[in-house]
Each structure stands twice: as structure tokens, then as C-alpha cells.
Amino acid sequence: MEFDYDKLSSNNITAPMDRLFKRVEIMDMDLLLNSTRNLDDDQLYSLNYLVDYVKQHKKALLTNIPVPDPVFLKIFGSAGTGKSHLIRLVSQWVELIMRTEGDNPDVPYIIRTSFTGAAASAIDGQTLHSSFALNFSGASTSLDDKKRDKMRHILRNLRVVILDEFR
């Protein structure tokens, strides 16, 4: 798989058609707190684990201390157990913690992806290949300086990648 860099516009990287990732639209704080309170113990543990990680990461960025090592967390559960709901709440909290006034909302801190369109839709995300404009032709695509710089700009804030339905 290679990145299809030609899908990136050479104009304005924040134009809606150039946006690689869906924005996380922050919900009303009362609704967010209420939804968080209604998580079961396992969901709350997972949310707190990720929120603590993101807080440590932000503190490291602000104080110039070493950034914590990346984490890989797998959430298991059968259909209807609230995995998609948990992913949406994690997205909300990551955005609330990391985003500062003046940040470009099209430069994400978190992205939600999945291998299938149905799973991506359930988490208000995108398929992995559409998120990163991956092509499956097998042809290698070289990256010129302008496109490389554009990708760096778009991905500079990225701290959390969610891949739903990962087996």
C-alpha cells in the first residue's frame, strides 16, 4: 500500500475536500459528562487510561520533558457492548484536552479509522485507506518536498489513532 499523494490539493490544505480526517465536533459539556458517568467500569478504566496518557503527553509538550512512549490499547467486546460509544467519548476528551484556542480544527489530535465503511460510520470516522488516501494499485508513489511538507503540516498534532475492528 502506498499513499496517494496526488489526492492532496496543492491549494489550501484546510479546504473541506483536502481534509484527510473528519473533525471531532465537541458535544455539549453536560452531555459529555453524563455520557462519561454512564460508562461501565471497564469502559471507564480504558477512557481514564487514555485520558491520563493524553494529559501526560500535553504536559510533556508544554514543559519540554520527554514525551511518554506510544501506547497500544485493544478494546474487546461483542456487538452492542459500547465500543463505538467509548471511541466517540475518547475522541471528545482527547480534543478537549489537547486543542487550544487558535488551533486549526482540520489539523487533528485524534483520528478514527476502520477497515470497513460500516465500522467507520459507527465511530464517525473514515476507512483507513480513505483517511490516508492509500491506493492499492501496488505502484510506488514518490513524495516531492511540497507534498511531504503538506503531510507533515496536517499530521503535526496527531497524538491518537483509533483503528476500529482491528483483529
Regions found by a protein language model. Give the residues of each.
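Conserved ATP-binding/catalytic motifs of P-loop helicase motor domains
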Residues: 1-167
